[in-house]
Amino acid sequence: MNILITNDDGINAPGIIALAKEISKEHKVTIVAPKDQKSASSHSISIHSPIKIKEEFIEGLDCKAYSVSGTPADCTQVGLSFLKENIELVISGINKGPNVGTDILYSGTVSAAIEGTIYGIPSIAVSMDVEYGKDDEDYSKAVKWAIKVLDIAKEEYLKSDVVLNLNIPNFNERDIKGIKVCKIGRSTYKTEYILLESNEEGDLYTTKGTRNAIKEEESDLYYLYQGYVTLTPLHFDFTDFAILSDVTKIFEK
């Protein structure tokens, strides 16, 4: 397959390099990724400023690679619309940290994959829960699961309007219990605002968020922290079809 690989952690992030090394053994890979760290960019795109696209050399990789000064969604657009590589699949990741629950709405990783489906290209988002503060993460288990899901999906289930959102738990590989296909949960946080500086220009704060207790069983949040790999099909259409007819009756009287 002709695969576009992107992320939101930046073109030199170890997760994207580990993924590209393995995927490129069996597929034609093009990397288009942000020049810098762009986590939590959500689905933003660059419309008020120009973007810089630069071909890059990444040691150990024998595939085309480009850095983009914009957002993860910009990167997907560049890969699909500007480079014209006839992409058949978009893979976004491997993200350092999980993208589960309603956190997916903030995620540049997931949004880069969703951008692919908006343009009719099947997409997979891959993220791995990590021990924060640790810089030498081993992404090999996440790579194995990504390839396993890719191999199954390309034979059984790759749909042009669906993102497969894959998350790997922070468990030793031998202790992972298997894979659960499940719904997203609801992520809420207790946010603390910490004053850093105060002057005539205003008050400068940093934030610290602590996740509230997970209440929804059978969700991606629940299963991930029980030691399961989670897989959730996502769609860019936010329409609530369950109540669409009821709302129509009320407002189209």
From Swiss-Prot:
GO terms for molecular function: 3'-nucleotidase activity; 5'-nucleotidase activity; exopolyphosphatase activity; metal ion binding; nucleotide binding. SUPFAM superfamilies: SurE-like. Belongs to the SurE nucleotidase family. Pfam families: SurE. A divalent metal cation binds at D8, D9, S39, N95. Its cofactor is a divalent metal cation. The keyword Kinase does not apply. Disulfide bonds: none annotated. It is found in: Cytoplasm. Signal peptide: none annotated. It catalyses: a ribonucleoside 5'-phosphate + H2O = a ribonucleoside + phosphate. Nucleotidase that shows phosphatase activity on nucleoside 5'-monophosphates. Keywords: Cytoplasm, Hydrolase, Metal-binding, Nucleotide-binding. One of its GO terms (cellular component) is cytoplasm. Its EC number is 3.1.3.5. The keyword S-adenosyl-L-methionine does not apply. This is 5'-nucleotidase SurE. It comes from the Bacteria.
